[in-house]
Amino acid sequence: MRTGCSYCSIQTFYTNGKIAVESNLAEKLEAIPLDPDKNYHIGSGQSSDSLAIGNTNGVLDAQLDFARKNSNIILEFKTKSKNIKYLLNADVPPNIFVSWSMNPQLFIDHEEHGTASLEQRLAAARALADSGILVGFHFHPIVNYQGWKKDYRYLVQKVLAMFSPSEVGLVSLGTLTFIKPLIQKLRMSGIDSKVLQIPMDKAAGKKSYPKSTKKKIFQMVWNEFRPWHGKVFFYMCMEEREIWDAVFGNCYENNSEFETALFQHVSGKMSHAQ
């Protein structure tokens, strides 16, 4: 059975289709030159899935120990997995939180092969929140298809019903964005995917929805999250100032300002979560 997401640029990072697991991750983390006077938001799972392989080769042990030794970081585990047994049984430091990619089950079935179902992701997030671990949600990619409004409204309402704002560190919004090598690889793979059927414009050297479509889909999801406005940190992934201003009514001046705001919001909730 094929696993992985058809649309993900991660597949262009690797050439042989194999997963490699570090045997000395703890040593490599120890060697990272962190400034004790600075704060860091570190995302684990940027080029993989933080929880899919569990604690193979002690990779989760190493990351928890790294977070425990560095109180000036917040370490985010990004996942589409239901594999949370390790975290439920571990002594998880308060500066770690876990975030899930959220999409309607229809999209998961067609494009996110071999990943946990929507219900499994939500149940896993609920279990970690119940254990005092902060969670987050990435509505990325939000996809415009026939019936998308109904499906995403249901999804947002499900999240709102299952979690309180105090349990959620952040919510991100994003959509399909393709780099040229990924488009070529997807076309040559023979994968039964519909993501390349979307109308795309050039966007910062990549391919993505037209700006008018982005504004429409982001605004709809943002409005559905109205009960959490001002209570949860929201942001958009890789979007221009014009889109931020149109949807949120504001935009950070630079990445440093954005990272400072994210760190303050998330770390503030971490101090109350456990």
Protein language model annotation of sequence segments:
Residues 1-5:
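Cysteine-centered iron-sulfur cluster-binding motifs in ferredoxin-type domains/subunits
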Residues 6-101:
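Conserved Radical SAM active-site core
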Residues 29-35, 86-91, 118-131, 221:
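Structured alpha-helical segments in the cores of large, soluble enzyme domains
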Residues 40-44, 75-77, 98-100, 135-139, ...:
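Hydrophobic faces of well-ordered beta-strands that scaffold small-molecule active sites
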Residues 48-51, 82-85, 96-115, 141-146, ...:
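Conserved radical SAM core fold
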Residues 129, 134-143, 152:
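Long, hydrophobic N-terminal alpha-helical segment
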Residues 147-162:
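Catalytic cores of alpha/beta
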Residues 160-274:
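Auxiliary Fe-S-binding modules of radical SAM enzymes
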